[in-house]
Amino acid sequence: GSQRNGIDGAHILTPMPDLISSGAMTANNVQVPMYILARLNLAGQCISVGNEYKDLKVGVDASQFRTAIAAKRASGKPVNAAMTFPGGTHDMWIRYWLAAGGIDPTRDISTIVVPPPQMVANMKVGSMDTFCVCEPWNRQLINQGIGYTANTTGELWHNHPEKAFAMRADYVDANPNATQALIKAVMEAQMFCEDPANREEVARICAKRRWINAPFEDIVDRMRGDFDYGTGRVVENSPQQMRYWKDQASYPFQSHDLWFLTENIRWGYLPKDFDMKAWVGKVNREDLWRQAAKDLGVAASDIPASTSRGLETFFDGKVFDPENPMAYLDSLAIKTVRG
């Protein structure tokens, strides 16, 4: 934390607070208790592929991609899929997509970690065949003529949870008033970003060197909800655009944390006997979100009555029931579950 010249909180991939709190993704498996205080957005990520596969016009169906990469591997060439952090959201999206297309992400392709700003450069030199990342890197890939968008992640799971606002538990416990002020500030920012009239201004802010440090032109279209896939397919005001406040985007449903942990079990990052519900109960502080929302004057109708968003249906027909995560896990054909 800040007492040791570190940080107390962050904009973070949704499952990471659980993985850090449990020690699953920390050095020497040291547990660092954290709290999820809000969700920051829904959807808005993309899976891109290189121009090597341009003729395939790969989309949500990865079956043709499966055939192409199998042939490439058979010729002795490496095949790589890049994401931003093991067990994180981008890792989960690209693994889900690959597996749904019959590609085993642990056997049929190498999964590598690449920081978001380095994705395009690595694709350009042929270090990877596909990647999953946030914007503006997918759009930048198209603008530089290096690849195209296969799908937006909302096409895999409509209005899926993505980033979270999380803080160290010791800071929150010691500073309840400051924590509430921070949550309310985040909520107000989410409301501002949700308004279409503000999207261009937000894009200009994000383009600055101190933030994303990328051309405005690479950011603005998709922030407005307009998606040019780089294949001739163009969708304006996409239903899969990123949401910041609408559709209860800010609320940290515990059911969503359960899905991410179930997927981490699916891919062997967590053991099958990992007590998901216990950890979610420790890490998810929806109670603090509710308090901040009420203090901010958020309408009661905009404050979810349940900790669960209910059944979640994916593009391949799979259904996740937060009341029975193991049934969902058992239904998945491709997985790497450890004891």
Feature-to-residue mapping (PLM):
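Secondary-structure end/capping motifs
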Residues: 174-285
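Short, glycine-/small- and polar/acidic-enriched structural segments
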Residues: 1-106, 110-112, 125-139, 146-159, ...
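A bilobed periplasmic-binding-protein/Venus flytrap-type ligand-binding module shared by bacterial periplasmic
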Residues: 44-57, 160-177, 192
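Short gly/pro-enriched beta-turn/loop segments at secondary-structure junctions
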Residues: 159-160, 201
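Conserved C-terminal helix/tail region of periplasmic/extracytoplasmic solute-binding proteins
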Residues: 258-339
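Short acidic active-site motifs
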Residues: 118-119, 137
